[in-house]
Amino acid sequence: MSKEVSVEGEQPPVKDYTDPPPEPLLNFGELRLWSFYRALIAEFVATLLFLYVTIATVIGHKEQNAADQCSGVGLLGIAWAFGGMIFILVYCTAGISGGHINPAVTLGLFLARKVSLIRALLYMVAQCLGAIVGVGIVKGIMKHQYNSLGGGANVVAAGYSKGTALGAEIIGTFVLVYTVFSATDPKRSARDSHVPVLAPLPIGFAVFMVHLATIPITGTGINPARSLGAAVIYNQDKPWDDHWILWVGPFVGALAAAAYHQYILRAAAIKALGSFRSNPSN
């Protein structure tokens, strides 16, 4: 009888999890691995495809409006293009490079010691080069429309101050990077084995939602590679005048999201001091 009671009272086993060890600041061993260069290629190609599809969508929308045709995809469609492409590309590249596709995401993961400094820097280079090539392809395919319709470049819209634009970029990037941390949290993955498969969905949806809020202000940066690619290929004064906002804002937002997730939600600083024991039911 006691045996039956003890069996009935047993709880289903809880999946254990362990945080991966922090990446070393300088991991030169990565430079000898083919998987490292494969990841760089994946980031380059993913960012190229991201910029090609999204900037082509922006230019197509503006062309239809300028020609007094139907309104095209509209701002909602543009937001879906950005969010949908992130969903697709993160799904395709997460197992190869982590699916960053954004220097701000890479910075946030570096600050959380998820990637080494060498990997972070070279990822950013690959992302920026991919963005430039992707926008260049758009210009090559639709040169007249590209040059006459703003080139998909991020600028501070009329009626908004640079301070407002900076704040919008900080908050928008915070939402994105915070979502990345939450969707890829190893503790969440340990509880539910299907979470890693679904991780691209909330990340893409976060990009979609942030675009809805920020397109009227800056055209939505939250990705310095996206902003740089369009600015380099369009190469006009206004995008360059506002360009610093599209680096400072996303990087500050990424830093804030990394600090919030690691030191508030995960209590990393307190755990390191040995004065806090996390509740396994959390």
Swiss-Prot record:
Residues 60-71, 142-162, 218-244 are extracellular. It holds the Pfam family MIP. PROSITE patterns: MIP. Keywords: Abscisic acid signaling pathway, Cell membrane, Membrane, Stress response, Transmembrane, Transmembrane helix, Transport. InterPro entries: Aquaporin-like, Aquaporin_transptr, MIP, MIP_CS. GO terms for molecular function: channel activity. Residues 1-21 are annotated as: Disordered. A motif (NPA 2) lies at residues 223-225. Can be used to improve resistance to abiotic stresses such as cold, drought and salt. It is found in: Cell membrane. The keyword Cytoplasm does not apply. It comes from the Eukaryota. Expressed in roots, leaves and fruits. Residues 1-38, 93-120, 184-196, 266-282 are cytoplasmic. GO terms for biological process: abscisic acid-activated signaling pathway; response to cold; response to osmotic stress; response to salt; response to water deprivation. GO terms for cellular component: plasma membrane. A motif (NPA 1) lies at residues 102-104. The keyword Transport applies. The chain crosses the membrane at residues 39-59, 72-92, 121-141, 163-183, 197-217, 245-265. Induction: Slightly induced by salt (NaCl). Accumulates in response to osmotic (mannitol) and cold treatments. Aquaporins contain two tandem repeats each containing three membrane-spanning domains and a pore-forming loop with the signature motif Asn-Pro-Ala (NPA). Water channel required to facilitate the transport of water across cell membrane; mercury-insensitive. Contributes to the tolerance to multiple abiotic stresses including salt (NaCl), cold and water deprivation, by modulating cytosolic K(+)/Na(+) ratio, maintaining osmotic balance, and reducing membrane injury (e.g. oxidative injury). Also regulates the expression of abscisic acid (ABA)- biosynthetic and -responsive genes during dehydration and salt stresses. Belongs to the MIP/aquaporin (TC 1.A.8) family. PIP (TC 1.A.8.11) subfamily. This is Aquaporin PIP2-7. It comes from Musa acuminata.
